[in-house]
Structure formats: C-alpha cells, structure tokens
C-alpha cells in the first residue's frame, strides 16, 4: 500500500530531465578581414539574446537559445558570431506558470554555458583576442518579459474601448 502511494507521489512530483543538448546552427563571419587585423584593436562588443521553445510531444520540449555577438572596431564590423544552442527537455508535473518559467528562464540558463563556450571558441579560431561573455540573469529577463506582456494585455482592452 505504501509502495502505491509512493509511486503516485513520484508521478505527481515535478520532474526535469535533459535529454540532449546540441548546436542547432552557427555562423562566424569576418567581413573586413584581413584589413581588420592590421588596425589597433579597440572593439565595441554587442550581445543579442533570444529564446524560443517548441513542444515536441507530451512533456517534451525543444528550447533554442540564440546568441548574436557583433564586434565593431571603429565603424567596421570585425566579426559577427551567431550561435543557436538547443536542448531537448522532458518536463512533467509543473503548473502552466512554472512550465513557462522553466522554458523561458531555467532551460536557457542550462544552455548558456554551452553557447558561451562555442562563441569563445569561434572567436579564438578567428584569431581575435579571447572573448568571455558575462553570465546572463535569465530569471530577470523572463520576469521583464512577463511584465511587458501583462502591460500590453492591460493596454489592449483600453485601446479596444477607445475604438468602440
């Protein structure tokens, strides 16, 4: 009897498993080489992030973290590095809100070190000085995203009423 109750508790308990982490796409461009190597190196580096998720089957999701790193030396683009790091995750027993947080913050947090290492490797292979991307607070980014959606949803009825 206790064994049956134990099994039911395990089925209801939240479960999170990483099935696979992989590189979905990557690109490294040096549009102004070799001239860029002959100039004094004083880059301005810009990082753009994006995440998306797809439901593959019951309780199985693909999450893709996209990083675009652009380094400009003066007005010229020194390099452009684009990486899509993806993972397949099995997630069970979460509320809709918890699932959204897992897909929008926790999974990207798992993927980021892999993407950061890949970007660093590509930049090094391009013979540029080492690039270490700072950690990203995906929880804060997700909270900001949720606030923006809530604000947009609150404004939408007001706009509809004004148009009526």
Curated annotation (Swiss-Prot):
Q: How does it assemble?
A: Homotetramer, a dimer of dimers. One homotetramer interacts with 1 SecA dimer.
Q: What SUPFAM superfamilies does the record point to? A: SecB-like
Compartment(s) where it occurs, according to its Swiss-Prot or TrEMBL record: Cytoplasm
- GO biological processes: protein folding; protein tetramerization; protein transport
Q: List where this protein forms a coiled coil.
A: none
Q: Domain of life of the organism in this record?
A: Bacteria
What is its biological role?
Answer: One of the proteins required for the normal export of preproteins out of the cell cytoplasm. It is a molecular chaperone that binds to a subset of precursor proteins, maintaining them in a translocation-competent state. It also specifically binds to its receptor SecA.
Task: Report what the protein is called.
Answer: Protein-export protein SecB
Keywords from the UniProt entry: Chaperone, Cytoplasm, Protein transport, Translocation, Transport
What GO molecular functions are on record for this protein?
A: unfolded protein binding
NCBIfam families listed in its UniProt record: PRK05751.1-3 (NF004392), PRK05751.1-4 (NF004393), secB (TIGR00809)
Family statement: Belongs to the SecB family.
Recorded hits in PANTHER family, A to Z, give: PROTEIN-EXPORT PROTEIN SECB, PTHR36918
Q: Which GO terms describe its cellular component?
A: cytoplasm
In Pfam terms, one family for this protein is SecB
């Amino acid at each position: 009897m206790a064994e049956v109750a134990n099994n039911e508790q395990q089925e209801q308990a939240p479960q999170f498993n990483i099935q696979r982490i992989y590189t979905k796409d990557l690109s490294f461009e040096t549009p102004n080489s070799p001239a860029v190597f002959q100039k004094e190196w004083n880059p301005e580096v810009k990082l753009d992030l994006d995440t998306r998720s797809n439901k593959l089957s019951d309780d199985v999701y693909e999450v893709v973290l996209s990083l675009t790193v652009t380094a400009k030396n003066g007005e010229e683009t020194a390099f452009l590095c684009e990486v899509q790091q993806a993972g397949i995750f099995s997630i069970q027993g979460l509320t809709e809100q918890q699932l959204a947080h897992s897909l929008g913050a926790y999974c990207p947090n798992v993927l980021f070190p892999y993407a950061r290492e890949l970007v660093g490797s590509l930049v090094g292979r391009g013979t540029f000085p080492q690039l270490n991307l700072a950690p990203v607070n995906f929880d804060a980014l997700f909270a900001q995203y949720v606030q923006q959606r809530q604000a947009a949803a609150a404004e939408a009825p007001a706009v509809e009423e004004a148009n009526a």
